[in-house]
Amino acid sequence: VTETNTNTIPVPADGFIPGPVLLLGAPGVGKGTQAQILMDLWGIPQISTGDIIRENIKQGTPVGREFQDLVAQGIFVPDDLVNRMVQGRLSKPDVGRGYILDGYPRTLGQAEWLDEQLDGPGFPGADGDMTAAGRLPVIAVSIEVRYDELLRRITGRRTGSVSKKIYNIYTHPPLVEGLDDVDGTPLVQRPDDTEEVFAERMKQFAELTAPVIEHYRGLGRFEVVDGEKSVETVTASIATALERLRHRTA
């Protein structure tokens, strides 16, 4: 994750309630970096479907077991099951001021279901009902980067085999080609950091995400920011867009 000085980032006025935030963007645009910065700035959690699924499987919950069974059989996991997992997570008290959605909603059906829930009484659970802030409408921001730049970010990525330090042969190369600055061991490329794998991931992203984007665009709850600027500039652009969208939905 890229380090940044959050003190230099202009953010919405004190008391700003972000509510539910959906960050969209293709693989490599920096969603993870930006999500972490916004979490630190506003003290809100990230709601990751990957984390929720792993936790349900670990705890052996009914939905966790159902998910495992479907995956083992090679059956597509239906929206209803994913929605139930998210519903359980959104019943926790830490979502009161808002949260960042990661990997959800991924389909139009999931987006429509979430909107229906947030427009209703919230998600009653063991910890009580979701607060009014947590039930604000979802607002979505897409971080956009040109395809050729994303390709450079992904295919140029190399990692120290021991230190795990991350490089990019185009933008942040090691001092000696192919060797880790830390210990001189060979750098490695992840098997999925190839042009062929990236092209397939981009195809899947476009097919899944396009309907979700159009859903929120149609509701007037969607904006785009340029992801090719500095980390700080992108964060400031996202914060400004979120404040504008939140005022629009107030």
Question: Language-model segments: which ranges?
Answer:
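Glycine-rich phosphate-binding loop of ATP-dependent small-molecule kinases
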Residues: V1-A250
